[in-house]
Design a protein with these regions (language model features):
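Active-site HxH/HxHxD metal-binding segment of metal-dependent hydrolases
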Residues: 56-57, 74-137, 151
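Active-site environment of divalent metal-dependent phosphoester hydrolases
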Residues: 54-55, 91-96, 117-120, 135-136, ...
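Active-site neighborhood of phospho(di)ester-bond hydrolases with catalytic His/Asp-centered motifs
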Residues: 48-49, 82-92, 111-113, 174-180, ...
């Protein structure tokens, strides 16, 4: 009976996902796993930071377990079919892995940061475009902003990372922060952009030997972000999928409750969950 209930719950989530995706072109975000997202936005299907490997296919980063630590809970075709654009914040394996390299068409449109130009060229992607600052793609405005992937010596090890800001007529402005810690630059971006939606990587990832220097936002930094987010909805992802991420959904939820942050203000997505972005 327990197995039957589990199976029904799994297929129930999948059915809900398919049903919501069948709506006309209403804007939404679906969390696949970790920081991999499907955006239905301005009439386009956009894939963000695809890590498509099966559970345990990538090395451990904290000496705890191989990564990812959980399987993708939806069919691969549901993720990749009809994708028109791929946004890649940076090319660490938890944001663009060997599986994504092998599964995605080499002719798919990719937008990447300047630091990763040679990476996509070397992988044979013929429609990868390096975004320095701003661009127009079809009916979308896309802006790239820098993120800070840690501090001190850890930052030197982690390299460059980026966030993306999406806007289009009649659509909410979406700020995909990418892998970044809380900084004055992020705060200024929010003040300048005034986004309607902020997607934050809140897993509190740490590098072994530098546990006091998080490389993405943890629960405390996420609270700082929420307090500076104005009227934006904050959507938290990048949790419960990697062995070096110490901030779990439960930890973040408890911190939000302690700070009187409502579930309407801070949305903690679960794998396969869809959140409608429409104003």
């Amino acid at each position: 009976m327990k197995k039957l209930i589990t199976s029904l719950l799994f297929f129930g989530v999948t059915i809900v996902a398919y049903a919501q995706n069948s709506y006309s072109q209403k804007s939404s975000i679906q969390l696949v796993r970790n920081a991999t997202l499907i955006l239905q936005y301005a009439g386009h299907k956009i894939l963000v930071d695809p890590m498509l490997s099966p559970k345990g296919a990538i090395e451990s980063w904290a000496g705890i377990a191989k990564n990812p630590t959980v399987e993708i809970q939806m069919p691969m075709r549901q993720i990749t079919d009809s994708v028109e654009l791929v946004l890649v914040s940076h090319t660490h394996a938890d944001h663009f892995d060997d599986a994504a390299n092998n599964i995605l068409s080499k002719s798919i449109k990719i937008i990447n940061q300047p630091a990763d130009k040679s990476f996509f060229n070397s992988k044979g992607f013929i429609n990868a475009e390096t975004l320095e600052n701003k661009m127009k793609w079809d009916n979308l405005n896309i802006e790239r902003v820098n993120g800070q992937h840690g501090s001190g010596k850890v930052l030197e090890m982690m390299g460059k990372t980026s966030g993306f800001i999406l806007s289009a007529k009649g659509e909410p402005t979406v700020y995909i922060m990418g892998d970044a810690i809380w900084t004055d630059r992020i705060k200024e971006n929010i003040r300048r952009i005034k986004p309607d939606i902020i997607i934050v990587n809140s897993g509190g990832a740490q590098i072994k030997g530098f546990e006091n220097l998080p490389i993405i936002m943890d629960e405390k930094q996420t609270m700082n972000l929420v307090s500076s987010s104005g009227s934006a909805k904050v959507i938290a992802v990048h949790m419960d999928s990697l062995d070096h991420c110490r901030t779990t959904r439960l930890v973040l939820s408890a911190e939000a409750k302690k700070n009187n942050i409502t579930k309407d203000k801070l949305v903690i997505l679960r794998d396969t969950e869809i959140y409608n972005l429409g104003k």
